[in-house]
């Protein structure tokens, strides 16, 4: 899980999801998981 100020989709499988006010990127590739913080 990468914690970044700006989260972006890295590949076409990435999805941007908002959970409890936190923006996250989910993907089939574990390296692409991110959250904003």
From Swiss-Prot:
Taxonomy, superkingdom: Bacteria
Pfam families: Ribosomal_L36 (PF00444)
GO cellular component entries: cytoplasm; ribonucleoprotein complex; ribosome
Keywords: Ribonucleoprotein, Ribosomal protein
Database matches in HAMAP family: Ribosomal_bL36 (MF_00251)
Protein name: Large ribosomal subunit protein bL36
InterPro entries reported in the protein's UniProt record: Ribosomal_bL36 (IPR000473), Ribosomal_bL36_sp (IPR035977)
Gene Ontology MF: a single term: structural constituent of ribosome
GO biological process: translation
Gene coding for it: rpmJ
UniProt similarity note: Belongs to the bacterial ribosomal protein bL36 family.
Source species: Colwellia psychrerythraea (strain 34H / ATCC BAA-681)
